[in-house]
A protein has these predicted regions:
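Amphipathic alpha-helical coiled-coil segments
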Residues: 74-89, 104-117, 160-175, 190-203
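Bacterial N-terminal signal peptides
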Residues: 7-16
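Sec/Tat signal peptide C-region and signal peptidase I cleavage site
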Residues: 17-21
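Short, charged, amphipathic alpha-helical segments
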Residues: 62-70, 91-100, 148-156, 177-186
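N-terminal propeptides/low-complexity segments immediately following signal peptides
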Residues: 23-42
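N-terminal, post-signal-peptide region of Sec/Tat-exported proteins
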Residues: 52-84
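Short, low-complexity, Pro/Ser/Thr/Gly-rich segments in the mature regions of secreted, periplasmic
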Residues: 24-28, 197-207
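Extended amphipathic alpha-helical interaction segments
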Residues: 108-149, 153-156
Length: 207
């Protein structure tokens, strides 16, 4: 009896397999020459999540994030323009081009996160504020409150502060004078306000 039931179950499984396969989504292009947009948008969000993780962990420096997010912003503009020219869709050729660019960006994110460059904050007030601001940027990128362009501009500003801090310390035996600390604090205040404005304006990352 058990053998009969097992044979019957296997027969049902074999018969139902083709029907199950037929019900799965078809990834082929639409008949009008355009392709579904899900994978482009999904990859975009996935890459922003990877960037956010790199920023928060310190694997991506401000300069690296600036460069990557600048490229992401350019790609986003290209996608927007292509869709506007084609009734809100990407053609198959455009999608292939976008996929190629996203592959290049993905490799850059991986390489930057695994190279020798790391964000080092140090156990001091200036370093702790830098780390806090990077965490806020990471949260804004991850949530979509900050666009790629906004993140690139903010990280460009953070990179400038980091370079000045490093130069000031190099000129003073590894320390900052009281005046230099006050100047850096003012710059960090300005960057902090910029982060807040970008996270609370009406611009969000494309979905």
């Amino acid at each position: 009896m058990q053998r009969t039931l097992l044979t019957f179950a296997l027969a049902v499984l074999v018969v139902s397999a083709p029907a199950f396969a037929q019900n799965q989504p078809n990834p082929q292009p639409n008949t009008n020459g355009t392709t579904r947009e899900g994978s482009v948008n999904d990859r975009r969000q996935d890459q922003q999540g990877r960037i956010a993780n790199g920023v928060q962990s310190g694997q991506l420096t401000a300069g690296e994030t600036k460069n990557i997010e600048g490229r992401e912003a350019n790609l986003n503009r290209e996608i927007k323009d292509d869709r506007s020219a084609n009734g809100g869709k990407l053609t198959t050729q455009e999608r292939q081009q976008v996929n190629h660019q996203q592959n290049n960006l993905s490799r850059s994110i991986y390489n930057d996160k695994h190279n020798a460059n790391q964000a080092h904050y140090g156990n001091n007030e200036v370093g702790q504020r830098r780390e806090n601001q990077q965490d806020r940027i990471a949260q804004g990128i991850r949530s979509g409150q900050m666009t790629a362009g906004e993140a690139a501009r903010t990280e460009n500003r953070e990179q400038g502060i980091n370079q000045q801090t490093r130069a000031d310390r190099a000129a003073n035996g590894g320390r900052l004078t009281g005046q230099e600390k006050r100047q850096i604090n003012r710059q960090q205040n300005g960057a902090s306000r910029q982060i807040y404005r970008q996270k609370h304006n009406n611009r969000v990352a494309p979905k």
